[in-house]
Amino acid sequence: MKARVPFIVAMLCGLAWAGNLESCASRCHEKFNRDAVCQCDRRCPQHDDCCDDYEHLCTAEEGPPEPEAFLDPEDKIPTSHLYSAPSSCQGRCREAYDKHHPCHCNDRCPEFGNCCEDFDSLCGGDHEGFSHSSDAVTKEELESISETIYRVDTNKAQKEDIVLNSQNRISPSETGNQVDRSPEPLFTYVNEKLFSKPTYAAFINLLNNYQRATGHGEHFSAQQLEEQGVFLREVMKTAVMKELYSFLHHQNRYSSEQEFVDDLKNMWFGLYSRGNDEGDSSGFEHVFSGEVKKGKVTGFHNWIRFYLQEKEGLLDYYSHNYDGPWDSYPDVLAMQFNWDGYYKEVGSVFIGSSPEFEFALYSLCFITRPGKKCHLSLGGYPLAIQTYTWDKTTYGNGKKYIATAYVVSSSQ
């Protein structure tokens, strides 16, 4: 009889455990459990497999949810492109120490005697516009300035300005299926009076200046170059960009507003080659207007561009795999769509933001966290922006162009 006691206890424990797998008691936000009858992870509402008590037990005292991952595989730049010459300081001045590099270009390399041979010629002296190690921007400072930018964006859309019809939401595993699950357009209504505001009008004037196919060189007329200048002048009049400049100036990144504007023009509008032709792409074209490379849509992270192309019948909205937690604009949507015959697997965009808001956040992250995930806070909710540098060619004294910038998950 005694020999059977452990067996009976084990069976009872097993039954108790099986019972737990039908409830979220002590399981809130655990990882996906394939042995469970129902789930309690953060994605279970999306996959419709939550336990019956998930909402009661796991969401009642929950803080602002973090965005789920919505990767954009078409935007990823191979690591080999981040540094074209690790034995040189070309495009690497003031970068963080990396033990994998044979020589270094940070402020302390002279102290340790491990600078690259061209450090003095490329990085020596007082190079304005570069941050020194003592001027490093903290995560808390990024969260604070992003909240400030969010607060002062008076040109953003109001709730009544945009009516969205987001329709079908899919799981991340389905984004590559290329199935149109939404019979209606994404935008039911947009108040186009927004587009008469100076920054919107200047932004829209830039969108028809590009050929979307890579491999075809971009050639700008005098008028088109002036349109770039008008856009920069208009955004710099806004509180959003004034706050950004003030922040970067106090961080010793720029000594004057003109230096800042000149750098913005180079990093965003400077041409480089993604294809076989010289000067067929730029950061602005890729991020805001969108490109087609090897039969797929790349970039295209702007709601105004999306709306205008959808209105013309050139864009077909398929589905979305992420909808942000914000109950006002700007919001974030990660979606799938067909752009006049070419598919975008995951395109994350701010919805209802002003042009200067996006331009400011992407610039902030590129300047302070180039090639990295940049953690921000908007209205109390976390989100992150991923940027990548393009330095097969550089400008100025080895500075890098923007390859891409887009919203990603805030979780690591």
UniProtKB/Swiss-Prot annotation:
Subcellular location: Secreted
Highest taxon of the lineage: Eukaryota
Cofactor(s) needed: Mn(2+)
Keywords: Disulfide bond, Endonuclease, Hydrolase, Lyase, Manganese, Metal-binding, Nuclease, Repeat, RNA-binding, Secreted, Signal
Chief place where the protein resides: secreted
A UniProt-annotated Pfam family: Somatomedin_B
Domain EndoU stretches: 138-411
Residues in SMB domain copies: 20-63, 85-128
Database matches in Gene3D superfamilies: 4.10.410.20
Expressed in which tissues: Specifically expressed in T-cells during apoptosis. Expressed in surface heat stable antigen (HSA)-containing T-cells populations (CD4(-)CD8(-)HSA(+), CD4(+)CD8(-)HSA(+), CD4(-)CD8(+)HSA(+), and CD4(+)CD8(+)HSA(+)) and not in the HSA(-) single positive T-cell populations of the thymus or spleen, suggesting that expression is lost during T-cell maturation and is absent at the most mature stages of T-cell development.
Annotated GO CC locations: cytoplasm; extracellular region
Disulfide bonds: 24-28, 24-40, 28-58, 38-40, 38-51, 44-50, 51-58, 89-93, 89-105, 93-123, 103-105, 103-116, 109-115, 116-123
UniProt-recorded Gene Ontology molecular function terms: lyase activity; metal ion binding; polysaccharide binding; RNA binding; RNA endonuclease activity; scavenger receptor activity; serine-type peptidase activity
Gene Ontology biological process: female pregnancy; immune response; negative regulation of lipid catabolic process; post-transcriptional gene silencing; proteolysis
Signal peptide: 1-18
Keyword presence, Ubl conjugation: no
EC number of this enzyme: 3.1.-.-, 4.6.1.-
Location of the active site: 286, 301, 344
Quaternary context: Monomer.
Family under the similarity heading: Belongs to the ENDOU family.
Function: Endoribonuclease that cleaves single-stranded RNAs at 5' of uridylates and releases a product with a 2',3'-cyclic phosphate at the 3'-end. The UU and GU sites are more efficiently cleaved than CU and AU sites. Targets mRNAs to regulate their expression.
PANTHER family: PLACENTAL PROTEIN 11-RELATED, URIDYLATE-SPECIFIC ENDORIBONUCLEASE
Protein name per the record: Uridylate-specific endoribonuclease
Organism: Mus musculus (Mouse)
